[in-house]
A protein has these predicted regions:
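Conserved micro-motifs of the catalytic ATP-binding
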Residues: 10-15, 48, 52-55
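Short conserved segments within the C-terminal catalytic ATPase subdomain
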Residues: 11, 36-46
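Short helix-loop "hinge" at the ATP-lid/N-box region of the Bergerat-fold HATPase_c
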Residues: 71-72
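Short beta-strand/loop element within the Bergerat-fold HATPase_c
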Residues: 78-90
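Acidic ATP/Mg2+-coordinating residue in the GHKL
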Residues: 98
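Short conserved segment of the HATPase_c
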Residues: 103-115, 135
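Conserved glycine-rich
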Residues: 143-144
């Protein structure tokens, strides 16, 4: 992840956004996360999606998987991770919602920073670069990411992909 971040920052890696359906992106992220989710006894689901957006398939898939992987990692056994996508003005909003541990409000503004790791997640493996990569990948395509969370109730990450 560190190498990818460095390559994105220096322009070695570029994105090539193209108009395409979002549904296969969601299904791909779920398929990739399914083994870990099943091992934890989590329910993974994607709501039916007919939305389309303009994005680089490879890099956006990586960004989405980073978010889904975190949702699986920080959701206790028996929990749920749901993906959905809806057109919203100039953007398509892709939501990853979980019933996980949540993120304290005071940390929400910092979680997209390079190397940031919240207090509640330090026991988990990682270096704090995944959400930074998500933000950078989306930004380079004209998109952005937001988070809404309450500790003990779960989190929703919303990835905004340009529709044109």
């Amino acid at each position: 992840a560190l190498v990818k971040a460095s390559r994105l920052e220096t322009g070695i890696i570029t994105t090539a956004p193209e108009p395409q359906p979002v549904g296969p992106l969601l299904e791909g992220a779920l398929a990739q996360a399914r083994p870990q989710a099943e091992a934890k006894g989590l329910t993974l689901a994607a709501e039916p999606c007919g939305a389309a957006a303009r994005f680089d398939r490879k890099w956006t898939a990586e960004a989405l998987f980073n978010v889904v992987d975190n949702a699986v990692k920080y959701t206790p056994a028996g929990g749920r991770v749901t993906l959905s996508a809806v057109p919203l003005g100039q953007f398509c909003r892709v939501d990853v919602s979980d019933t996980g541990i949540g993120i304290p409000e005071e940390e929400q503004g910092r979680i997209f920073g390079r190397f940031y790791r919240g207090g509640a997640v330090r026991a988990e493996e990682g270096v704090g670069i995944g959400l930074y990569l998500v933000r950078e990948i989306l930004r380079r395509q004209g998109g952005y990411v937001k988070v809404a969370s309450r500790p003990g109730q779960g989190t929703t990450f919303s990835l905004y992909l340009p529709r044109e």
